[in-house]
């Protein structure tokens, strides 16, 4: 997304095969598109942590689209930083609790 503010998202390699996508500001449809594009460009075996803890405003439609992204993602994707409403929405839309990761660290043996 060419007009997306670059300060609103950051990609941080955590370890080989693992990446954090950190979003801030408003979580809107453009934000989901950024996440979708990043995830689609990664190898299948990559673990992706989407960190929404710095988001000030969540758009419900964007949260619903995020559920769709999580459903079709080839990479393993975990989301953190959700507020209760967004967590409940994602659960209602079929996202497993194991994908709604409360932290960024995941032991290698836990699969």
Regions found by a protein language model. Give the residues of each.
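STAS-like cytosolic regulatory interaction modules
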Residues: 1-111
């Amino acid at each position: 997304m060419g007009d997306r503010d670059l300060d609103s998202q950051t990609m941080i390699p955590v370890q080989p095969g693992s990446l954090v996508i950190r979003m801030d500001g408003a979580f809107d449809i453009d934000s989901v598109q950024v996440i979708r594009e990043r995830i689609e460009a990664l190898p299948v075996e990559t673990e992706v942590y989407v960190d929404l803890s710095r988001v000030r405003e969540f758009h419900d439609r964007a949260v619903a689209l995020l559920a769709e992204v999580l459903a079709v993602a080839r990479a393993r994707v975990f989301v953190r930083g959700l507020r209760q409403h967004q967590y409940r929405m994602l659960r209602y839309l079929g996202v497993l609790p194991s994908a709604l990761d409360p932290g960024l660290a995941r032991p290698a043996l836990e699969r």
